[in-house]
């Protein structure tokens, strides 16, 4: 009797998506550098072409946000020490501000965040609250999300509101397969209507369909 051969399910691993998001973020950094250079020198004959490239690279970087938020929602159950993870994410978010500020600005510290790193921390905190208080009623869960949106607006966290909206859908529908990705696509479409820079992020839910654990 021939031995049974178990085939591994085909798909794209979290390592692939993590690497893709890093590449997109780096492209966005290049776009920000190019934009900063063009603002200081608008006499270049290729000003319009380079400006369009800078805008395209920044739009591509926004496509990394739904990928990171999706991975965060998927990996949340596997994090054992959530307090330590929260501290690590917060420290990394603060450290990420320094090079970002130097790239797109002239100061090391600004009163408002200039990168979406703190938005990931805020999403992680509300997810921990949802996980810890699983018996919370729907109105209280909504109140947690609304308070996160409020803090995001008060602290002027860059891309904070879109990140919270996208993450909320990813978190609550993370075990729903195609339905979850469809709802994520709907939210992304609404975000893109408000901010056309998110247009290039619209194909991301279709790509996440091939995610495998």
Locate each region found by the language model:
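Alpha-helical transmembrane segments and their immediate juxtamembrane cytosolic regions
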Residues: 1-213
């Amino acid at each position: 009797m021939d031995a049974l051969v178990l085939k591994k399910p085909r798909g794209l691993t979290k390592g692939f998506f993590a690497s893709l998001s890093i590449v997109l973020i780096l492209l966005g950094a290049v776009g920000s550098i190019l934009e900063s250079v063009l603002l200081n020198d608008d006499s270049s004959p290729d000003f319009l072409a380079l400006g369009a490239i800078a805008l395209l690279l920044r739009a591509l970087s926004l496509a990394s946000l739904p990928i990171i938020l999706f991975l965060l929602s998927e990996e949340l159950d596997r994090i054992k020490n959530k307090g330590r993870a929260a501290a690590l994410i917060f420290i990394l978010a603060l450290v990420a501000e320094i090079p970002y500020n130097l790239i797109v600005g002239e100061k090391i510290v600004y009163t408002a965040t200039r990168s979406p790193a703190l938005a990931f921390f805020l999403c992680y905190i509300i997810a921990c609250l949802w996980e810890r208080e699983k018996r919370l009623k729907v109105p209280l869960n909504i109140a947690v999300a609304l308070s996160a949106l409020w803090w995001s607006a008060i602290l002027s966290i860059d891309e904070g509101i879109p990140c919270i909206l996208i993450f909320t859908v990813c978190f609550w529908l993370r075990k729903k397969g195609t339905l979850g990705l469809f709802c994520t696509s709907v939210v992304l479409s609404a975000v893109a209507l408000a901010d056309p820079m998110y247009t290039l992020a619209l194909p991301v839910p279709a790509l996440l369909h091939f995610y495998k654990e």
